[in-house]
Amino acid sequence: MSRKCQITGKKANNAMAVSHSHRRTKKLQEVNLQWKRVWWPEGNRFVRLRLSTKAIKTLEKKGIDAMAREAGINLNKL
């Protein structure tokens, strides 16, 4: 499985590390991904998702059904 948020689709960003002498080298800024068990009331069960921490905060505000609908994800397959 790739390091990608299952709800928002966030993935790593290519960036530059700049030293004090201003030498630039490529670096990868990874997304802060966490495995999260989320209660899905419509399915009456837990769903295990790999989410970014930003998506976890949004999930607590909006709910799993609304976020899955926006992302076009079928929770029955998870």
Swiss-Prot record:
HAMAP family noted in UniProt: Ribosomal_bL28 (MF_00373)
| Segments of this protein annotated with the region Disordered | 1-23
Name the family the entry cites: Belongs to the bacterial ribosomal protein bL28 family.
Q: Which PANTHER family match?
A: 39S RIBOSOMAL PROTEIN L28, MITOCHONDRIAL (PTHR13528), LARGE RIBOSOMAL SUBUNIT PROTEIN BL28M (PTHR13528:SF2)
Keywords tagged on the record: Ribonucleoprotein, Ribosomal protein
Origin: domain of life? Bacteria
Pfam families membership: Ribosomal_L28 (PF00830)
* GO terms, biological process: translation
Q: What is this protein called?
A: Large ribosomal subunit protein bL28
Q: Which GO terms describe its molecular function?
A: structural constituent of ribosome
Matching NCBIfam families, A to Z? L28
Q: Name one GO cellular component term.
A: ribonucleoprotein complex
